[in-house]
Amino acid sequence: ECRWYLGGCKEDSECCEHLQCHSYWEWCLWDGSF
C-alpha cells in the first residue's frame, strides 16, 4: 500500500505514483509528473 500526498515516508518507493518522498519533511509530495 502506497502513501498518498503528505503521507509519512522514508523513501520515494513508499509513495504513490507521481509522488516523491521529501527528504527533510519526510512526507510524500508531487514529483511534477503526470
UniProtKB/Swiss-Prot annotation:
Disulfide linkage: 2-16, 9-21, 15-28
Keywords: Amidation, Disulfide bond, Ion channel impairing toxin, Knottin, Neurotoxin, Secreted, Toxin
Location(s) in or outside the cell: Secreted
Tissue expression pattern: Expressed by the venom gland.
Superkingdom: Eukaryota
InterPro entries noted in UniProt: Huwentoxin-1, Huwentoxin_CS1
Family: Belongs to the neurotoxin 10 (Hwtx-1) family. 62 (Vatx) subfamily.
Domains: entry comment: The presence of a 'disulfide through disulfide knot' structurally defines this protein as a knottin.
Protein name per Swiss-Prot or TrEMBL: Tau-theraphotoxin-Pc1c
Species of origin: Psalmopoeus cambridgei
